[in-house]
Curated annotation (Swiss-Prot):
UniProt EC number: 1.5.1.5, 3.5.4.9
Regions crossing the membrane: none
Origin species: Bartonella bacilliformis (strain ATCC 35685 / KC583 / Herrer 020/F12,63)
One annotated GO molecular function: methylenetetrahydrofolate dehydrogenase (NADP+) activity
Gene3D superfamilies to which the protein is assigned, alphabetical: Leucine Dehydrogenase, chain A, domain 1, NAD(P)-binding Rossmann-like Domain
Keyword Oxidoreductase (UniProt): yes
Name of the molecule in the record: Bifunctional protein FolD
Highest taxon in the source lineage: Bacteria
One Pfam family recorded for the sequence: THF_DHG_CYH_C
N-terminal signal peptide: none
Function field: Catalyzes the oxidation of 5,10-methylenetetrahydrofolate to 5,10-methenyltetrahydrofolate and then the hydrolysis of 5,10-methenyltetrahydrofolate to 10-formyltetrahydrofolate.
A Gene Ontology BP annotation from the UniProt entry: purine nucleotide biosynthetic process
Keywords on record: Amino-acid biosynthesis, Histidine biosynthesis, Hydrolase, Methionine biosynthesis, Multifunctional enzyme, NADP, One-carbon metabolism, Oxidoreductase, Purine biosynthesis
């Protein structure tokens, strides 16, 4: 269907521009963007995510470094590694793959990353800049940044007169998404799983962002005809039709039921996910440019 937003294709276009801008940095200023990824333990899902990020970084022409720490590593050792990377001029972006083991304080780890190298956009200073509408100076969390690019592709950069509803209030997606949409002049409602009359609120949305972590929660009767639906959810559910014990990935939106009612909708997989990794590359490229006080490439 023509109304399905192809996240893979859009991400490929973003990556092509990142490659081009990386070549310019190398040729004009002899600088290669560098990213360091830290993974603690051997969680299979985390291993897959880290491998895809590292592969994409190398594809972009970045210097890429991966640090694998044992699950039982002391928090102090992790913080010491972050401090070393903070001081390394070859590294412009640092990310700690989440989740971390229970004995490590996630906030202490993410806040230890230098603000200018916080390419996940999780540092309180970057969050504060975004909330204060100082977007040009902030590093924007990757998933909201990617979702926003998809929305702009459909609606343009000025969302005046449009109602946007976000279902999900996380610091990683919901809250930064609300700030970005507000900055683009949308009228924003930030809802969550405990919001009263949630289906009715969703039906008012010209732009509906689902980021609540509940598989196929958003049904057809929740969606306004002609809405743009961005599904950030990624959930694994049983797929007995594939065989015993098999699973499949679905979003927070009941895609098959909802898609015919929308102006545009993102699938899961192949929607927001590829854009998240693409925006991580964008953030790293921008961090490298800022490190030399060069103009920041626009995307």
């Amino acid at each position: 269907m023509d109304n399905i937003i192809d996240g893979k294709k859009l991400a490929e276009n973003v990556i092509a521009k990142v490659k081009n801008e990386t070549e310019k940095l190398k040729n004009s200023h002899n600088i290669q963007p560098g990213i360091a990824v830290i993974i603690v333990g051997d969680d299979p899902a985390s291993q897959v995510y880290v491998a895809s990020k590292s592969k994409k970084a190398e594809e972009c022409g970045f210097f890429s470094m991966k640090h694998v720490l044992p699950k039982e590593v002391e928090e102090s050792e992790l913080l010491q590694l972050i401090e070393i990377l903070n001081s390394d001029p070859k590294i412009h972006g640092i990310l700690v793959q989440l989740p971390l083991p229970a004995h490590i304080n996630t906030d202490r780890a993410t806040q230890a990353i230098a603000v200018e190298k916080d390419v996940d956009g999780f540092h309180y200073i970057n969050i504060g800049k975004l909330a204060a509408n100082a977007i040009k100076d902030a590093i924007i969390p990757c998933t909201p940044a990617g979702a926003m690019m998809m929305i702009e592709q459909q609606c343009g950069q000025d969302l005046s007169g449009l109602n946007a509803v976000i279902v999900g209030r996380s610091n990683i997606v919901g809250k930064p998404m609300a700030a970005l949409l507000t900055a683009a002049n949308a009228t924003v409602t930030l809802a969550h799983s405990r919001t009263r009359d949630l289906d009715e609120i969703c039906r008012r949305a010209d732009i509906l962002i689902a980021a609540v972590g509940r598989p196929q929660m958003i049904k057809k009767h929740w969606v306004k005809k002609g809405a743009i639906v961005i599904d950030v959810g990624i959930n694994r559910i049983a797929a007995p039709e594939k065989g015993p014990g098999k699973t499949r990935l679905v979003g927070d939106v009941d895609f098959e039921e909802v898609k015919g009612k929308t102006l545009a909708i993102t699938p899961v997989p192949g929607g927001v996910g590829p854009m998240t990794i693409a925006m991580l590359m964008v953030n790293t490229l921008k961090a490298a440019a800022r490190s030399l006080k060069l103009p920041v490439p626009k995307f």
